[in-house]
Amino acid sequence: MDTTGIPTSFYEHDALSLAPMLLGKYMNMGGVSLIIRETEAYMPNDSACHAYKGKTNRNAPMFAKGGILYVYLCYGIHQMLNIVTGPQGEPQAVLIRAAELISGASIVQKRRGSLDLIGPGKVGQALALNKTFSGEKLGVRLSICDAPEVSYTAHPRIGIGYAQKKDREALWRFVMTPTSL
């Protein structure tokens, strides 16, 4: 595992380009290390994007320059981890949908009661995320470290029934293939 952080210029890519590039990368925080296995892209012109209708207090981090976190509460219980991408003023982000545990099993077991990290709420719980992370630069508490490129498949996103049909059907969910590591 490469233990160096990724340069901030990496996060200047748009979310659709960056989402598959994050697959296979390592996330580290507080004794827990994970491999990113599934992501979803959210772009400014995307009706599923939280910033689609404009800036609010909740989605304000999405309007920052790429390389910060956007963490929000979903269904009143799940903390969802997003990596903000692109230039300042163009709101876009990549949702981390699933991960694989590399180290810190006892910590994750205590937090979750399970080591299953398939689902964005489970990833947030494993990392003990809360709203104080939203707007924070990567590398302060949560770091993402480089890893070789992996193969992946593209699929429609999940849980966006409210979005326009074209956005619901877009192949903007990326899943690392099992043989990639």
Language-model features, listed with the residues they occupy:
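Conserved, well-structured core segments that form or line functional sites
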Residues: 1-181
